[in-house]
């Protein structure tokens, strides 16, 4: 099911290209419950368009490890009034972690940079994803989001 997949179907890439060609400068996809790639594509008129296919869940009480990793984008947009152009001049992805205790209690969100192995070892999602750890989250992030968009 592509809605839960970190991979992208051609339909999403084609739709992003259409939106870019129709004039979008930034495209943010939603719904898959997991993070998906971030990239620049070129619109028909030559503009560079930022595409964020999915930021995943910001906060949820779902029961699978990959759905605990979400993200926020920090985007700088620059407008040149003389040339009448607008462009994304900086785009950085910050990982977030939805954390909950056993029985889906005490749900909260952390920046991935502030998350620890100790927290991960107590996460309620370990009942369905025993391998869940800080390394698991960092590996997932680096597998999906290219270094160009990662902070640090």
Where are the predicted features?
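Single conserved hydrophobic/aromatic residue that forms the stacking wall/gate
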Residues: 1-12
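Conserved beta-sheet core of the metallophosphoesterase superfamily
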Residues: 13-71
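A short C-terminal boundary segment appended to hydrolase-like catalytic domains
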Residues: 65-152
């Amino acid at each position: 099911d592509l809605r839960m997949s970190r991979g992208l179907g051609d339909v999403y890439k084609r739709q992003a290209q259409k939106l870019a060609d129709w004039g979008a400068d930034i495209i943010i996809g939603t719904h898959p419950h997991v993070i998906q790639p971030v990239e620049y594509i070129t619109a028909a008129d030559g503009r560079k368009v930022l595409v964020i296919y999915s930021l995943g869940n910001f906060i949820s009480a779902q029961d699978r490890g990959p759905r605990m990793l979400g993200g926020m984008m920090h985007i700088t947009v620059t407008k040149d009034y003389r040339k009448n152009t607008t462009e994304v001049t900086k785009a950085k992805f910050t990982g977030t972690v939805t954390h909950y205790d056993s029985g889906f209690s005490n749900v909260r969100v952390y920046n991935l940079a502030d998350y620890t192995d100790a927290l991960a070892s107590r996460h309620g999602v370990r009942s369905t994803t025993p391998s869940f750890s800080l390394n698991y989250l960092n590996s997932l992030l680096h597998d999906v989001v290219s270094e160009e968009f990662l902070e640090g």
